[in-house]
């Protein structure tokens, strides 16, 4: 009677004791307070749907091909694909931990059987099953962390592609700007060379002082040196682009020689609400998923401190052959149902829980910092874009005015009404204004590229959630 009461007591109290061990993981979502509106002006007349492949609007088919080629050979994209595969494998392993495991065993031997007192051949085969019953959700929390990190890895794959597209677009814009400035430098060198030639003829005829002719020759030499330096910079940019894309350099130079249409003034638009743009940033999404994964790992670490329940079983068959007689044996078992209760581990489990909590705090801090950084990057790109728009008309007017002034001064110099010093001064200002206009056009395109990258490159968080299925992730990795 006493034994029966004891069994009843433990059977009643054990579920209550287990249920009392509640696991309280930190929140999977960390609240943030992005600004309600952008402080910098937004670009107008662009389309929100044009962000994903905005570079197709530039009228530069070469850029489209270069970006596709760079994304195909980029080590960053390949690394992101590898991390998706790693995260997928971790997810499969974490889900498998929730299921029973089944192992097959087989063996055969021949020797002296003590029970039969003779030589016998023994063979046996069986199946061994085991299952850890996830009482406190440790394995479920591990699976949740794996799911979150897989979603984050998929987002980072898109970010890698966005980074490559932005880098190639920036490098191509820099190269085309360099080539435009090279044309300006070569025209200037040709003009100064002609001035030096005419000054030399005038000097030999006795109409120009030797010092003035020397100034013209020095100016021509300076222009040649500047053109040579500019050509070197362009060659360096070409080789950088070759390394990014894997193109052959002769083919790239041939394509660069073809004329390209001027880029439109407005390429795309972004959402008016900062929260909407933040939702399209893959790095912000990954940081958010890392917080959720760290939260799940805290729950898993806490669950390791509580009892664990496992169930095992087996089924098998054996046969023994001795002296021409074969004996068959079949066995099966269910159990034991084993309960493991941690009593003392020197504080190891508590320390692991504290470490998981510290990682969660770190992930939450990094997530908030990532949100602030994303807002700052968008704001900075908008400011640069607005600044280039405001300066464009003035820079164009200045370049046209200084060019007209130089043409007039050159005509006066040819007629003997202006000195060579006046001509060179007008030339310097015209050259500086023309180079400034070319640089401003590059700066504006660079601002568009920075805004494209800061706005997430057209990524969609809802699409990322849908891509959490194995088939979708495999398709994306390809």
Describe each region flagged by the PLM.
Residues 203-207, 413-417, 454-458:
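A short glycine-centered flexible hinge/capping loop motif at secondary-structure junctions
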Residues 60, 73-76, 132, 179, ...:
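Short loop-to-helix capping motifs
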Residues 63-65, 122-124, 170, 215, ...:
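Transmembrane beta-barrel architecture of outer-membrane proteins
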Residues 139, 155-273, 384, 388, ...:
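Periplasmic alpha-helical coiled-coil/stalk elements that build and connect Gram-negative outer-membrane
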Residues 67, 124-128, 172, 274, ...:
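Membrane-embedded beta-strand positions in outer-membrane beta-barrel channels/transporters
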Residues 2-72, 147, 231-279, 321, ...:
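Terminal intrinsically disordered/low-complexity segments used for targeting and assembly
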Residues 78, 98-120, 130-161, 179, ...:
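Small/polar (Gly/Ser/Thr/Ala-rich) solvent-exposed segments
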């Amino acid at each position: 009677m006493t034994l029966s009461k004891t069994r009843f007591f433990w059977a009643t109290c054990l579920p209550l004791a287990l249920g009392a061990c509640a696991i309280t993981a930190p929140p999977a979502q960390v609240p943030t307070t992005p600004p309600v509106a952008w402080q910098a002006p937004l670009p107008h007349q662009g389309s929100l749907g044009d962000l994903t492949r905005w570079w197709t609007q530039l009228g530069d088919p070469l850029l489209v091909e270069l970006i596709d080629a760079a994304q195909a050979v980029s080590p960053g994209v390949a690394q992101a694909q590898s991390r998706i595969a790693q995260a997928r494998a971790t997810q499969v392993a974490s889900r498998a931990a929730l299921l029973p495991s089944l192992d097959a065993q087989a063996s055969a031997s021949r020797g002296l059987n003590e029970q039969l007192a003779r030589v016998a051949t023994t063979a046996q085969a069986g199946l061994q099953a085991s299952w850890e019953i996830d009482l406190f959700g440790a394995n479920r929390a591990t699976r949740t962390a794996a799911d979150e990190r897989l979603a984050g890895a998929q987002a980072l794959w898109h970010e890698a592609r966005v980074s490559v597209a932005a880098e190639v677009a920036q490098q191509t814009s820099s190269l085309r700007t360099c080539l435009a400035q090279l044309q300006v430098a070569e025209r200037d060198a040709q003009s100064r060379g002609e001035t030096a030639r005419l000054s030399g003829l005038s000097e030999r005829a006795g109409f120009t002082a030797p010092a003035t002719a020397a100034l013209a020759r020095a100016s021509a030499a300076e222009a040649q040196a500047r053109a040579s330096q500019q050509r070197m910079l362009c060659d360096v940019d070409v080789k950088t682009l070759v390394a990014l894309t894997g193109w052959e350099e002769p083919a790239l130079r041939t394509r660069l020689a073809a004329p390209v249409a001027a880029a439109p003034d407005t390429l795309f638009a972004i959402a008016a609400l900062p929260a909407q743009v933040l939702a399209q940033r893959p790095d912000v999404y990954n940081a958010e998923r890392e917080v959720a994964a760290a939260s799940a790992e805290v729950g898993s670490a806490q669950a390791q401190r509580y009892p664990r329940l496992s169930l095992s079983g087996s089924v098998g068959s054996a046969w023994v052959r001795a002296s021409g007689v074969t004996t068959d044996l079949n066995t099966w078992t269910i159990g034991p149902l084993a309960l493991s209760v941690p009593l003392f581990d020197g504080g190891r489990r508590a320390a692991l829980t504290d470490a998981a909590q510290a990682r969660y705090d770190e992930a939450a801090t990094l997530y908030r910092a990532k949100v602030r950084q994303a807002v700052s990057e968008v704001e900075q790109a908008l400011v640069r874009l607005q600044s280039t728009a405001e300066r464009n008309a003035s820079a164009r007017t200045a370049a046209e005015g200084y060019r007209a002034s130089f043409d007039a001064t050159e005509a006066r110099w040819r007629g003997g009404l202006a000195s060579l010093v006046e001509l060179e001064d007008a030339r310097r200002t015209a050259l500086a204004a023309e180079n400034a206009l070319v640089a401003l056009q590059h700066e504006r395109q660079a601002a568009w590229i920075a805004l494209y990258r800061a706005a997430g490159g057209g990524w969609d968080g809802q699409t990322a959630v849908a891509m959490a299925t194995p088939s979708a992730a495999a398709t994306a990795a390809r």
